[in-house]
């Protein structure tokens, strides 16, 4: 029996959801699992390597790298959140997930996602202080301040996402139990509820605007100030050097915000977009940043690059 027929025949309230993986490509799941597995093999060891190098290399105990360690922790968390259901579906066809497990996964995925947005904003502030106020860099970004920034970021993410599982749990799910994805997302679960989801939709939009919306605008504002300062530097070599310190962060910002904003726009306004596009965008927004961030920072950061090269060559 296929997922579609199972979903159509389900007229009673189900205690579980069924994750479909990539709809329409079920026969190719075993082959799709190969690049997905490779991505996890890059993401998890890659972020663990970043954390280990920053912890053991005393020269990296600076604000920029402390924020990078936060980013690596979040990327590690995102990878581990999706790993069980993704590999379960593509390897052994384990598609069932209980409502409570789905809501828990949903909470952690969204919490880590919005926490990553906060840390990327913090890293933009770090670059702003380093370039625009270099003489006050150490006095402004002390370890205490960095710790408080991390706690505030965590508190904001948890506070905003905590209501979502309870808002979803109060609804009946009496139609098809099939979630057209490989993991649980708020927008996907809402589609299965047999109730008016207007309040959930409004709250979801509020969360996105108050996190990703505000953070992305503040990052743009930070880089506008950075660019103004850089253009006022007389030496061309110094201008290039200053901008070069921002390249890794700009790559991380683009890797995170581009698919996330695209996915949010498609979910809310692109009703005619093929569902496969939504699924692919969902994979990009959750899997690409954890895979690419360690690579980008390893390539662009000499201390990290040297340690990684030394570990593999000796």
Swiss-Prot record:
It comes from the Eukaryota. It is a multi-pass membrane protein. GO terms for molecular function: G protein-coupled receptor activity; olfactory receptor activity. The chain crosses the membrane at residues 31-51, 60-80, 105-125, 145-165, 202-222, 243-263, 279-299. Pfam families: 7tm_4. It is found in: Cell membrane. Residues 52-59, 126-144, 223-242, 300-314 are cytoplasmic. Glycans are attached at residue 8. Signal peptide: none annotated. Residues 1-30, 81-104, 166-201, 264-278 are extracellular. Disulfide bonds join 102-194. InterPro entries: GPCR_Rhodpsn, GPCR_Rhodpsn_7TM, Olfact_rcpt, OR51/52/56-like. Keywords: Cell membrane, Disulfide bond, G-protein coupled receptor, Glycoprotein, Membrane, Olfaction, Receptor, Sensory transduction, Transducer, Transmembrane, Transmembrane helix. Belongs to the G-protein coupled receptor 1 family. Odorant receptor. This is Olfactory receptor 51G2.
